[in-house]
Amino acid sequence: MWTVRTEGGHFPLHSPTFSWRNVAFLLLLSLALEWTSAMLTKKIKHKPGLCPKERLTCTTELPDSCNTDFDCKEYQKCCFFACQKKCMDPFQEPCMLPVRHGNCNHEAQRWHFDFKNYRCTPFKYRGCEGNANNFLNEDACRTACMLIVKDGQCPLFPFTERKECPPSCHSDIDCPQTDKCCESRCGFVCARAWTVKKGFCPRKPLLCTKIDKPKCLQDEECPLVEKCCSHCGLKCMDPRR
């Protein structure tokens, strides 16, 4: 007589405590749970946020450091940028990140964009970690980053209160043609630029606790070389050197 071994001993197959129906039910339940788990994984395969657009024409792709968003720590996403997949902060402009040398023993010359001085600079990359402000050569760095601040000035978006909305752009390079990434009542949006004086406005603060009433609408309303800049409200400011 056939029996089934359990922790408590043996049950005959014709025993009332054993049933092929029970086996079939458990098998179907297991398959259903696996299918549900697979569907949930498929639905939740992306973390919030948008990856930056690829800015280079890639003739050779570099080895990927991730395959999906969940290969990346915390809120980072797996993005294709500078000819390879890498973990990136979807809420920061890559070319504005500080230089990161990495923490392995290998050394190779790479290039990063020095946003403060507005130029591409070489550095020694140690091969692990780091960030997305990391390019194989100077040409790639310049192509990816030199247009992150386009000529022109953001137009006025009159508002007394600001809502925190997901940004539709992170920097000017995310916007088509001559449009700029501008502060609006609801996050940052691409907008047609105004004609401006030479120089660039100081960097915008990450967060404004209060939006001041506009002191100007465009550069022509500011004295001498001052520019009309968006800095928690429009105001005349000395251009960034």
Curated annotation (Swiss-Prot):
WAP domain location, by residue?
Answer: 44-91, 147-194, 195-240
Molecular-function annotations in GO: serine-type endopeptidase inhibitor activity
| Known tissue expression | Expressed ubiquitously, the highest levels are found in the epididymis followed by testis and trachea.
Position of the signal peptide: 1-38
Task: Name the InterPro entries for this protein.
Answer: Elafin-like_sf, Kunitz_BPTI, Kunitz_BPTI_sf, Prtase_inh_Kunz-CS, WAP_dom
Superkingdom of origin organism: Eukaryota
Any one cellular component term from GO for this entry? extracellular region
**Record keywords, A-Z:** Disulfide bond, Protease inhibitor, Repeat, Secreted, Serine protease inhibitor, Signal
* Annotated BPTI/Kunitz inhibitor domain residues: 95-145
Query: In which compartments does the protein localize?
Result: Secreted
Gene3D superfamilies cross-referenced by the UniProt entry: Elafin-like, Pancreatic trypsin inhibitor Kunitz domain
Query: CDD domains recorded for this chain?
Result: Kunitz-type
The disulfide bonds in this chain are: 51-79, 58-83, 66-78, 72-87, 95-145, 104-128, 120-141, 154-182, 165-186, 169-181, 175-190, 201-229, 208-232, 216-228, 222-236
Q: What is its main location?
A: secreted
Q: SMART domains attached here?
A: KU (SM00131), WAP (SM00217)
Q: What is this protein called in UniProt?
A: WAP four-disulfide core domain protein 8
Please tell me the species this chain comes from.
Answer: Homo sapiens (Human)
Lineage of the source organism? Answer: Eukaryota, Metazoa, Chordata, Craniata, Vertebrata
